[in-house]
Regions:
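N-terminal small-residue-enriched
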Residues: 1-99
């Protein structure tokens, strides 16, 4: 089983597919990451240092901005991520029919 997933090649975060312990070394594409803190399953961690105010990229798109500096291997969550969704938090799910 894979330990993480990087959804898009432009992402600067990956998602833990299991709890990841501090000190674990992971290779994510071209990034060598030593995890700095407990990363809960389903949560994001930085693949490279992300400076305060820098965009956080997931799915190949900006999902928010770092509220503080985040080290490579650091947990990226509500405590250090400001959403880029704006004040409007409504959306309509419209699945695309396949084939």
């Amino acid at each position: 089983m894979q330990d993480f997933i990087r959804i898009h090649e432009d992402d600067n975060v990956a998602v833990a597919l299991r709890p990841i312990a501090p000190g674990e070394n992971l290779t994510v594409g071209q990034y060598q990451v030593t995890v700095g803190e407990e990363i809960p399953q389903g949560h994001k961690f930085a693949l490279k240092p992300i400076a305060k105010g820098e965009e956080v990229i997931k799915y190949g798109f900006r999902i928010g901005y770092a509220k503080e500096d985040v080290a490579a291997g650091g947990w990226v969550h509500v405590h250090n991520l400001k959403t880029a969704l704006g004040d409007l938090l409504e959306y309509q799910y419209e699945p695309v029919a396949s084939g």
